[in-house]
Amino acid sequence: MRKLIQSGFTLIELVVVIVILGILAAVAIPQFTDLSASARDAVGQGACGALQSTAVLLYASNKTQTPIATIISSTTVTGGTFNAGTCAATTFTPTGGSAVSCQTIPTAICS
């Protein structure tokens, strides 16, 4: 007579695997949350760089100071909005994020 061979995992083995997966998920999820926050900050910094580049390009083509409102309206950035400000204090608010302060645009090219 042949002996019956059972194969498969025991309940304890399955519980151990589920516990390990739970621990890994608890460690990994906060890291992904931090990545999305830093990505929003990077979008803000990129938008500020685009604003400064637009100011320089407008000055180079017009050879005169350009109002900050014109610089903002000439800058095309997706993923947030510029807040009306001055050459020294313009901010960009990424969608779902907090405002990022843009570096000062020199008053020689911005009015």
Describe the predicted segments one by one:
Residues 33-49:
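Aliphatic-rich helix starts adjacent to a transmembrane/signal segment
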Residues 53-111:
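Periplasmic/extracellular, small/polar-rich flexible segments of pilin-like filament-forming proteins
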Residues 1-8, 19, 45, 51, ...:
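Short, contiguous, well-ordered secondary-structure segments
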Residues 4-7, 38, 60, 74:
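Surface-exposed loop/turn and secondary-structure junction residues enriched for glycine/proline
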Residues 3-32:
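N-terminal single-pass transmembrane signal-anchor helix
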Residues 26, 34-37, 53-56, 60:
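Regular, well-ordered alpha-helical segments
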Residues 1-9, 95, 109-111:
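A contiguous, well-structured "functional interface" segment within a domain
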